[in-house]
Amino acid sequence: MKSSLAVLSTARSDTTTTYIGRNQMIAPMAFQAKRSTFLCPLLVALAILFSLTAVSSGTSWAKDHAGSSQATVSAVAGDNQAVTAKGEVKNSFAPIKTCFNFLKEQPFVFILLALAIGYPLGKISLWGISLGPTAGTLLVGVLISIIGQNIFGIIYGIPSIVSTIFLLMFMYALGLKVGPQFFSGLKTGGLAFIVIGLIVWSLNWLICFFGVKLAGLEAGFAPGIISGSYTITAIIGVAQTALTNGAYTPPPGVSTEQIGANIAAGYAISYVLSNIGIILLIRYLPQIFGHDPIADAQLAEKELSGGATDPVPGAAGSLSLGFSHFDLRAYEVDHQEIIGKTVQEFFHLYPEAPILRVVRQGKLLNLSENNPIKRGDIVSVRADVHELIADGKKLIGKESDSILARDVPIEVADIHIGSRDVAGDTLAELGRSIGFGLQLKALFRFGQELPLLAGTAVQVGDVLRFVGPDFCIQQAAKRLGGRPILNSSITEVMYMAIAMGIGYIFGSLSFNFAGIPFALGTSAGCLLAGIFMSYWRSRNPEFGGPMSEGARSFLQDIGLNLFVAVLAAAVGPKIIESFHGTTAIWVAIIGILGALVPPLVAFVVGIKVFKLNSVVAAGASTGARNSTPGLNAICEQSQSAVAAVPYPLTYALTTVLALVGGYFAMLLS
C-alpha cells in the first residue's frame, strides 16, 4: 500500500510539472488570445470615435466650403443652389446626430457605452502601462460628451443622484473589505498617515496658489485649480461662499460672475487631467521605486493580521474550503471488532477517523439514531489518506466504490460561542465532546486568530471555524449555543441599507466655523459604515446577515466606474469651453503638478522615513489626495484591498484642510 501511495504521489508530481511547463509554453499564445478578445470590440469602438472626430473637422470644412460656394453660386445662378448645398451637408450627418441624440434621450445607454468601451481600453497595456478600467471609462465618457457638444450641439445631463448612489455603494463595499484591518492599521501607522496627509495638502496648496500667481492668471483660478486637482467639488462652494458673503472683494472692473467662471474653468481642466494622472501615478508608484505591489500587499496583510493564517469571520475567503489533507473513503464492514458498535462508540475508539455516513442495503441510515453497525454495512470515513491506506483493511474492511457512501458534502462554518456551559473548556475537551466528524480550522477572539493548542480555553464570544458535514456542524452549533454561518451567495440587503443610511446621515452632518462649512462627507461616511459593519462581523459573524463576496466585489467594481461615467458626461464640455489662449495651458500644467507632485513626495517620505509598506504608503497618499479612483487602481495593481487601510484617515484629514485652504486661496487671490 505504501508503494502504491508513493507511485500516486509521483504521478501527481509529474502531472503538475508537465502542466506548469505547458502553461509556460502557451503563455504567449494565451496573451495573444486575451489581447484579441479586448482589441476586437475596442478597435470597432475607437473606429467609431475616430470617424466622429473626423466628422467634426469635416463639418467645419463643409460649412466653410458651403459658405464660399454659396457666394459664388448666388453670383452666377442665384441663392437657391447654395441653400441646396447647405442642406445636403447638414443631411449627410443626420444619422450620426440621431445616434448622439439617442444617447441624450437615453442616458443609461450613454453610461453603458462608456463602460463597454472604457473597460477594454483600460486593459490595453503599452510598455507595461495601462490606464485601468476607471481611467478608460472616464476618458471615453469625456470624448463622447465633447464630440456631442462641439459637433452636434448636444449637452448630456445625467441626474447627479445616479452618480452619488453608485459612489456610495462603492465606498460601502470597500469598507466591508478592509474593516478588520482598519483599526490595526491605525495603531501601527497613525502618525505616519497624518504626516502624509499634511504633506499632500500643504504642497498642493503651495503649488496651485503660487503657480497661479507666477503665471499671472486672474482671480478665481487658484481655488478652481485646487478643487480640480484635489477632485473635491465642495471647494468650489467654499470659494463661492467667500464671494457671496463679502469676505472677498473683486478687483475693480472684474465681476463676481467672471471670477465664478474662472473657478469653474480651473476646476474643469485640472479635474479631468489630474483624475487620469493620479490613477496612473498611484497604480505604478510601488513599481517606480522598485517594489513588487503584489508581494508587498501580501506582506502587509500578514503584518496587519498579526501573523494569522485564516481570514477573519466575514472576510473574503473565510468560508472557502481550501486544501485539506483529509479525504473521504468508503469501506465495507467485515471485522468483528467493529460489528455491533455504534457510530459514537467508534468515534471514541478512533477519533482520528470518524464515520460520517452508513449505507445499509442501499439506504442511508440516520446517524442521530446512533444505531449499531452490522456486517456488510458500507461506512464513510474522513481521515488522513495515508492512515486509511495503511490501516484501513485491518480496522474496517475492504474499500468500497459506493457512490452513495462517498457522496458526503463538506461545509465550512463559523460558529459564535453563545453558551456559558462550554466557557472554560479547552479545545481538547471540546474535541472529545462535540468534535465528531469535524475539523477545527481556526479560533478567533475579538477578531484575532489564536493558535490551535490543546490547552487553549474558549470563552463566550469566541468564533470557531469548523470543516465537516452539515449534520455534524449543526450538532456542534447546538452545543456551543450559536448559529452556524455557512458560505452563501445571498446578501442581506436590510443591513446594507441601514448601515449605508447611517453612514450617509453621519457624513452629511456639518458645522460652520468662521463661515466655512465642515463635514466628513457622505462618501467617507458610507466607507466608515462598511468598515464598522465588517469589524463587528469579524467578532460575531451572526451580525449583519450574509454578504456574498461576489456581490461585494461587484458593488466595488461597478459602483466606481458607473460614477465615473456619469461624471464624464458633465465635465467633458466644460473642458473645451475653457481652452483659450495660454490660460488653459497654464491651468493644465499647474493642475497636473498640484495633483501629482504632492502624493509622490508623500509616498517617498512614507517608505523612506516611516518605513511604510509600499502599498500602504500608496493608499495613504491617494487618500490624502482624496482620489477614490486612485485607490481602486492600487487595489487592482496589488490584487489586494490593504491599501484602503490608511485611506479613511488621510481622506478625512485632508478633506477638512482642503476646504480651509480653498477658502483662503479665494481670499488671497
From Swiss-Prot:
Family, similarity comment: Belongs to the AAE transporter (TC 2.A.81) family.
Gene Ontology, cellular component aspect: plasma membrane
Organism: Desulfotalea psychrophila (strain LSv54 / DSM 12343)
Protein name: Uncharacterized transporter DP0386
Pfam family, one: Asp-Al_Ex
Molecular-function annotations in GO: monoatomic cation transmembrane transporter activity
Biological process terms in GO annotation: potassium ion transport
Locations listed in the record: Cell membrane
Classification via InterPro entries: AAE_transporter, RCK_C, RCK_C_sf, YidE_YbjL
Bilayer topology annotation: Multi-pass membrane protein
Occurrences of domain RCK C-terminal (ranges): 316-397, 398-483
Keywords, sorted A to Z: Cell membrane, Membrane, Repeat, Transmembrane, Transmembrane helix, Transport
Membrane-spanning residues: 39-61, 124-146, 153-175, 190-212, 221-243, 263-285, 484-506, 516-538, 558-580, 585-607, 645-667
